[in-house]
Amino acid sequence: MDFAQVKDYLVNLQNNIVAGLEQADGGSFRRDSWDRPEGGGGTSCVIEEGNVLERGGVNFSHVHGKGLPASATAARPELAGRAFEAAGVSLVLHPRNPYAPTVHMNVRFFAAIKEGAEPVWWFGGGMDLTPYYGFEEDAIHFHQICKHALQPSGSEYYPRFKKWCDEYFYLKHRKEPRGIGGVFFDDLNQPDFVTCFNLTKSVGDQFLAAYVPILQKRCNLPYGERERDFQAYRRGRYVEFNLVWDRGTLFGLQSGGRTESILMSLPPIVKWRYDWSPAAGSPEAKLYTDFLIGKDWLPLD
């Protein structure tokens, strides 16, 4: 296990992604470095009211502490009470144009440390796409890049991590997926550190290729108040998932993370309506019937 190597990679990844997004948007991200009193810190890069991105954040954090929070030990009670060190890059981008999808990507490394014992470590991460008005070619492109990112590690990873993503980004209280998925993994520590690190790096390194072509294709499509209204309504689902179900958000808040950085994933304009559903056959209804269905977007090998 080489924590310094992982940290160096993550810092460079954040810089590379921000540079790519600034080129795509034409605007600049604000860089905000911060320290965590309990140990560690990070850098948040945020854009608001950009040319294409209404709000977006690319966050790097490296935190450590004496005791793991409850969200980190829920599945592994044997780690309770261990010291921890965690580092990751997490991003969420909310474009202004309703035809351009929201996207989330995260790669992270975690170590639970106890004196006199081997550290327990694992990687996690993934990326997923949340359209408001779906395009099949965009879903296929996104999943193709996800599959391509995992292919060098073995052909078994994409179907496994795709299924995991569909199951994780699911709003149980709404009984609907958050979006059209992608890939998601956690607790990855087999077969060895180098293999797991290489897989995680490949996911991070392929993010721009997965998302920027979709953003560029959709960001200039004409739209009106109707589309913005539906976008704001569907963004409400994003807020619900992040605040109710997301393990990363819960870990950040429970471990004394920086609230501004943790909640930068939330969209700037959101609406809720009581017991609303789109008219049958409308473009808005198509999102539910054709896209939020846990579909296999690529042919199964």
Swiss-Prot record:
<comment type="function">
    <text>Involved in the heme biosynthesis. Catalyzes the aerobic oxidative decarboxylation of propionate groups of rings A and B of coproporphyrinogen-III to yield the vinyl groups in protoporphyrinogen-IX.</text>
</comment>
<dbReference type="GO" id="GO:0006782">
    <property type="term" value="P:protoporphyrinogen IX biosynthetic process"/>
</dbReference>
<comment type="similarity">
    <text>Belongs to the aerobic coproporphyrinogen-III oxidase family.</text>
</comment>
<feature type="active site" description="Proton donor">
    <location>
        <position position="104"/>
    </location>
</feature>
<dbReference type="GO" id="GO:0046872">
    <property type="term" value="F:metal ion binding"/>
</dbReference>
<dbReference type="InterPro" id="IPR018375">
    <property type="entry name" value="Coprogen_oxidase_CS"/>
</dbReference>
<keyword id="KW-0627">Porphyrin biosynthesis</keyword>
<feature type="binding site">
    <location>
        <position position="173"/>
    </location>
    <ligand>
        <name>a divalent metal cation</name>
    </ligand>
</feature>
<keyword id="KW-0560">Oxidoreductase</keyword>
<keyword id="KW-0350">Heme biosynthesis</keyword>
<dbReference type="GO" id="GO:0042803">
    <property type="term" value="F:protein homodimerization activity"/>
</dbReference>
<dbReference type="GO" id="GO:0005737">
    <property type="term" value="C:cytoplasm"/>
</dbReference>
<comment type="pathway">
    <text>Porphyrin-containing compound metabolism; protoporphyrin-IX biosynthesis; protoporphyrinogen-IX from coproporphyrinogen-III (O2 route): step 1/1.</text>
</comment>
<feature type="binding site">
    <location>
        <begin position="256"/>
        <end position="258"/>
    </location>
    <ligand>
        <name>substrate</name>
    </ligand>
</feature>
<comment type="subunit">
    <text>Homodimer.</text>
</comment>
<keyword id="KW-0479">Metal-binding</keyword>
<feature type="binding site">
    <location>
        <position position="94"/>
    </location>
    <ligand>
        <name>a divalent metal cation</name>
    </ligand>
</feature>
<keyword id="KW-0963">Cytoplasm</keyword>
<protein>
    <recommendedName>
        <fullName>Oxygen-dependent coproporphyrinogen-III oxidase</fullName>
        <ecNumber>1.3.3.3</ecNumber>
    </recommendedName>
</protein>
<dbReference type="Pfam" id="PF01218">
    <property type="entry name" value="Coprogen_oxidas"/>
</dbReference>
<feature type="site" description="Important for dimerization">
    <location>
        <position position="173"/>
    </location>
</feature>
<dbReference type="InterPro" id="IPR036406">
    <property type="entry name" value="Coprogen_oxidase_aer_sf"/>
</dbReference>
<feature type="region of interest" description="Important for dimerization">
    <location>
        <begin position="238"/>
        <end position="273"/>
    </location>
</feature>
<feature type="binding site">
    <location>
        <position position="104"/>
    </location>
    <ligand>
        <name>a divalent metal cation</name>
    </ligand>
</feature>
<dbReference type="InterPro" id="IPR001260">
    <property type="entry name" value="Coprogen_oxidase_aer"/>
</dbReference>
<feature type="binding site">
    <location>
        <position position="143"/>
    </location>
    <ligand>
        <name>a divalent metal cation</name>
    </ligand>
</feature>
<feature type="binding site">
    <location>
        <position position="90"/>
    </location>
    <ligand>
        <name>substrate</name>
    </ligand>
</feature>
<dbReference type="GO" id="GO:0004109">
    <property type="term" value="F:coproporphyrinogen oxidase activity"/>
</dbReference>
<feature type="binding site">
    <location>
        <begin position="106"/>
        <end position="108"/>
    </location>
    <ligand>
        <name>substrate</name>
    </ligand>
</feature>
